[in-house]
């Protein structure tokens, strides 16, 4: 039997910073070139027309336009940017 109670330190107490992932611009919204559409881990949503992929799988608009989500297959989605006239995005 131990004569003193063991002084153990907690093995918890760690947490990672939030990564703020998710959809940032929804379907039908106007975006400018370079706007982030989706922050994600892996390719949960595939890039469609006029959408680029960042180093961390961030999807962003390559042109000014309107965001459109659609189904890539039965289980996967894709996001595209439909270009619009310059007068519409200037307002």
UniProtKB/Swiss-Prot annotation:
Keywords tagged on the record: Ribonucleoprotein, Ribosomal protein
Gene Ontology BP, a term: translation
GO molecular function, one term: structural constituent of ribosome
Alphabetized InterPro entries for the sequence: Ribosomal_bL27 (IPR001684)
Positions of the UniProt region annotated as Disordered: 1-24
Top-level taxon of the source organism: Bacteria
Cysteine disulfide links: none
Signal peptide region: none
GO cellular component, one term: cytosolic large ribosomal subunit
Family of this protein: Belongs to the bacterial ribosomal protein bL27 family.
HAMAP family: Ribosomal_bL27
PANTHER family: LARGE RIBOSOMAL SUBUNIT PROTEIN BL27M, RIBOSOMAL PROTEIN L27
Name of the protein described by the UniProt record: Large ribosomal subunit protein bL27
UniProt source species: Chloroflexus aggregans (strain MD-66 / DSM 9485)
């Amino acid at each position: 039997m131990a004569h003193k109670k063991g002084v153990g330190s907690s093995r918890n107490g760690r947490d990672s910073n939030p990564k703020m992932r998710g959809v940032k611009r929804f379907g039908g919204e106007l975006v400018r070139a370079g706007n982030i559409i989706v922050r994600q881990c892996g390719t949960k949503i595939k890039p469609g027309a006029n959408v680029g992929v960042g180093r961390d799988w961030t999807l962003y608009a390559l042109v000014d336009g309107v965001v459109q989500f659609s189904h890539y297959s039965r289980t996967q989605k894709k996001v595209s940017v439909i270009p619009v006239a310059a007068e519409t995005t200037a307002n």
